Design a protein with these regions (language model features):
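Serine-dependent carboxylesterase/thioesterase catalytic core
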Residues: 1-9, 22-24
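A conserved short beta-strand
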Residues: 10-20
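Extracytoplasmic/secreted proteins, especially bacterial periplasmic and envelope-associated proteins
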Residues: 11, 53, 57, 109, ...
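Alpha/beta-hydrolase-fold catalytic nucleophile elbow
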Residues: 18-19, 41, 71-72
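Acidic catalytic loop of the alpha/beta-hydrolase fold
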Residues: 22-24, 45-49, 76-77
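Short alpha-helix in the alpha/beta-hydrolase fold that links the catalytic acid
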Residues: 29-30, 36, 50-60, 83
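Short beta-strand/loop motif that positions the catalytic acidic residue
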Residues: 34, 40-42
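Catalytic active-site module of serine/aspartate enzymes centered on a nucleophile-bearing elbow/loop
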Residues: 74, 84-128
Length: 128
C-alpha cells in the first residue's frame, strides 16, 4: 500500500490551539510535519481534558516548541467568552467559572496574547 503524504493547507501560516482534545491519540510522529508557529493554551483546572493526556500530548508531538500557556484556576469552559444572561440561564455548566476566576478579565488578556502571537508569527506578504 502506498504511503500517503500528510495533508497540508498552505494558507495556514500560524495557529492558536485552545483546550486541545484527543492529544493522546497522536502517534509519536503525528505532528512532525507541522511547520507553522503554534500557540497552545491549556486550562490548569480542566477536569474534562486532564493533564497530561491532551494539550501536553500535543505540545510534546510538535516538532518545534509552541508558545505554551497554562491558565491558572481556569476550567474547561473558561476559554468560552463570558455568556449572556440568557445563555447563563439555560447552560450554567458552561457559563460558570471556578470560584475566583474572572472570565471577562481573562478574555481581555487572552485576546491581547493571541493578537500579539499572530502579529509575531505572521509576516507581511505571507498571505495564502
Amino acid at each position: 500500500m502506498p504511503v500517503s503524504r500528510p495533508w497540508q493547507d498552505r494558507r495556514i501560516k500560524a495557529a492558536v490551539l485552545v483546550a486541545s482534545a484527543m492529544g493522546f491519540t497522536l502517534s509519536p510522529n503525528g505532528l512532525k510535519d507541522v511547520k507553522v508557529p503554534i500557540q497552545l493554551w491549556r486550562a490548569k483546572e480542566d477536569v474534562f481534558l486532564p493533564h497530561p493526556r491532551y494539550a501536553e500530548a500535543v505540545r510534546k508531538a510538535l516538532p518545534e516548541a509552541p508558545d505554551y500557556r497554562v491558565v491558572a484556576n481556569a476550567g474547561r469552559f473558561d476559554f468560552i467568552p463570558p455568556c449572556s444572561k440568557a445563555l447563563s440561564g439555560i447552560a450554567p455548566a458552561i457559563c460558570t467559572g471556578a470560584p475566583g476566576f474572572d472570565r471577562a478579565a481573562f478574555h481581555q488578556t487572552f485576546n491581547v496574547a493571541v493578537i500579539a502571537f499572530f502579529g509575531r508569527a505572521l509576516k507581511p506578504g505571507q498571505a495564502g
